[in-house]
Structures are given as structure tokens and as C-alpha cells.
Amino acid sequence: MSITIRKLDSTSAGFGAELRALLAFEASEDAAIEQSVAQILADVKSRGDAAVLEYTNRFDRLSASSIAALELPQDALQTALDSLAPKARAALEAAAARVRAYHEKQKIECGTHSWQYTESDGTVLGQKVTPLDRVGLYVPGGKAAYPSSVLMNAIPARVAGVGEIVMVVPTPDGVKNDLVLAAALLGGVDRVFTIGGAQAVGALAYGTATVPAVDKICGPGNAYVASAKRRVFGTVGIDMIAGPSEILVLCDGTTDPNWVAMDLFSQAEHDELAQSILLCPDGAFLERVEKAIDELLPSMPRQDVIRASLEGRGALIKVRDMAEACRIANDIAPEHLEISALEPQQWGQQIRHAGAIFLGRYTSESLGDYCAGPNHVLPTSRTARFSSPLGVYDFIKRSSLIEVSAEGAQTLGEIASELAYGEGLQAHAKSAEFRMKH
């Protein structure tokens, strides 16, 4: 059965409205979920380990006697790594090495060092950069086990110099995923608790007798986890609340249509709300891609999910030229942007808003997901207009440094007191004036 995918044309009168309708997405808040999460968090804050243990045993069908019994020692992580098939272990180790190398380079290039300068009167001004003390990493369990996400969250935190990384991962029915545990070891995770859900987020945010309170929580999760992260924000930092996955492909019509179709599938297979869009100035090529979609879809294990995603939120869009495609891409601000063209660098220079930019026909988005090196935790839902991929900079903070000399206190005191009086804050003014020589 052929797929029915939305087709748009940028020259049509209603294109702007059609594009806005295509992109429109608002995460629905389920009142029952919100109420349940609020109750769980309050319970964890009040009763600590006892509440976390109760919810974990109930939701994951366990019979643990204590939270301490749910912590995995480092040798369990080593055992998981050693149990992997040689090819799986080699792939995981290679991915970890590449992700680490990229983030080590990022640390050097992205202003993650302290600095200061001295003014002529001896006043010293600067900035002190320090890593976070402790970070919590949430990792989904069960069927949705993503070792790549462990690497992408843990490694930049470790490279940044975070003092301790605490990972939580649910193990429904006691089933552990060796790839996830091996990734935790390779990523430098210090402690692993086999707990999940809103109760795990609460334990990380508030701390319990066994689970230490963290300064920031990162990592993906289901609707309960997302709700819990929203609610504890402010008590701790969070990375982001991610929406459905997205891919936007800009193609000049010179790439194999099968490649492009499979790239669209690569995001559509995540879930029914994922969004896959193709922009191309060649109408005949768009038809070839549509044909490739119909031919390839029956061979995909997740074809039902892919079909629902492409029919519900996907689109094939004909544009005037590649320059217009770039302008539309900047408006969409996608999570993943592929520029599959003969001159990808030329068009890439015109892109201002995208979570990750994949240049050239050989650069599939999936390579970035797993092993290229850059982080795969990316802004979604057009937030790439103002936010960035997860990186080393998310695990550091900056403090201003001010050391005023006796001479500087005269000059700055005069300015500060004048402004303070203007704001009606006499103590501010006097605090500066007391240090001035009259």
C-alpha cells in the first residue's frame, strides 16, 4: 500500500500558512500524569528512600529490600562490558573515543577557561570557570535502551570536570541492559542506581539517605520523566525538555533517492510524532524519493511507526532553488539538518539555525547519532533558534571576579554612589562612599 505524504510547493499562495501548520506542535500535558508526578515528587521529598523504594518495586515489578540494594558496583559495569560480543564492544569503545575526542576539542575552543585582566589603577576583573559538583544522568530502561545517549550525556560532563556523575536507569522485572551498563563504564559514570521514573528524578533533585542530590539532571525519558524534570527545574538545572525528533533534508536532486528516503525513515522510526521533511528544487526528484519510500517501507521492521510519522507530520516540499531551501530551513530551525548536495559547504554557510548540520551526501544523520563525535542531544521544536546541542559548556558555570584596588575604589565609588542615590538605595551608596578618601 503506497504512502500518502504531504506535498507542498513554495510558489503556492498559501505556502506560508501550510508550512506553519506542518510545523505546529504543542506537547500535550496529561492532567493525570501531572497529578501523579506531583504526588510522587512530594512523596520522595518527604519520605526519601522509602518512597523511592516503594514506587520502584511497584512500577518495575521488583522486590528490592533497600535502595542500597539497587546500586550497581563498578565491577558490575565491567562485567557488562566484558560480556559484550567483540564487535559490539569495539563499536561502543570506538564511539566513546570519538565522542570524547570531540568534546576535549570543544573544551579548548569554547571558552571553558578562567581569565582576568588588570586595569591601570590595579583593579583586577575577570571570570572564574568551574565545573558542576555533581550531575544526574537519566537513562531510559526496558525496550527503549540507548547506550549512545549514555555516552553523549556522560562524556561531556566528565570532560568538563564534573566531580561526580550519578546515573539512574530503571530495570523492569530486574532486566539489565549490558550495552547501557558498559556505556556507563566507558562514559565515566561514578554511581549507577537501577531506579527510574519520576521517583528517580525526585531522588536526584532532592537527595535521599542513599541517592545524593545533584546540581543538574540530563537525559531523555517518557512523559512522567519529562514532567518531573519540568517540576524540579529551579531546585536543579536540567538539560532540556525535548520534543519529537526531527530531520530536514535539503537536496539538490543529485543524491540517490534511496539514500534520502532512508534518511527520512531514520527519524520517522522514532515515533509517530517525529517529523521528516525534504526540500528540493527538482520536482522529478521528489517523485523519485516518493517512489523509493513506497518501495523501501515494506522492508522496515518499524514500518507502521514510519508510515504514521510520514503521513501525519512528514512532507515533500518543492522550492524555487537551494537558496530558498536554506531560507526555509532557517525558519524551521530543525534538530537535524542534512545538506545533501554537490556543494554542501556553500549552502551550509547560509544556515544559521539548526541543532546539527550534516554536510554532503555521505553524511547520514545516523552517523551523528552514534559515532561521529558531536553530541546527539539537540534542540527540537524550533528551539535551535536560541539554544545549542548539549556540550561541555552545559556542565560548567562562570563566576565574575572583581578585586578593586584602593585607587579604583575612589573612581568606581563615585560612579556607584551617584547611581545608587538615583535609585534610592542609600546603603548601596554609603557602602561605596565609606571606602573613598574624602
Swiss-Prot record:
- Which UniProt keywords are listed? Amino-acid biosynthesis, Histidine biosynthesis, Metal-binding, NAD, Oxidoreductase, Zinc
Which residues are the active-site ones?
335 (proton acceptor), 336 (proton acceptor)
Q: Which pathway does UniProt place it in?
A: Amino-acid biosynthesis; L-histidine biosynthesis; L-histidine from 5-phospho-alpha-D-ribose 1-diphosphate: step 9/9
GO cellular component, as recorded = cytosol
Quote the record's binding site residues for substrate.
Answer: 245, 267, 270, 336, 369, 423, 428
Read off the InterPro entries from this record.
Ald_DH/histidinol_DH (IPR016161), Histidinol_DH_CS (IPR001692), Histidinol_DH_monofunct (IPR022695), Hstdl_DH (IPR012131)
Instruction: Please describe what this protein does.
Output: Catalyzes the sequential NAD-dependent oxidations of L-histidinol to L-histidinaldehyde and then to L-histidine.
Q: What is this protein called?
A: Histidinol dehydrogenase
Asked if the keyword tRNA processing belongs to this entry, the reply reads no
EC number in record = 1.1.1.23
Q: What's one GO MF term for it? A: NAD binding
Q: Which organism is it from?
A: Burkholderia lata (strain ATCC 17760 / DSM 23089 / LMG 22485 / NCIMB 9086 / R18194 / 383)
Per the record, the similarity remark reads: Belongs to the histidinol dehydrogenase family.
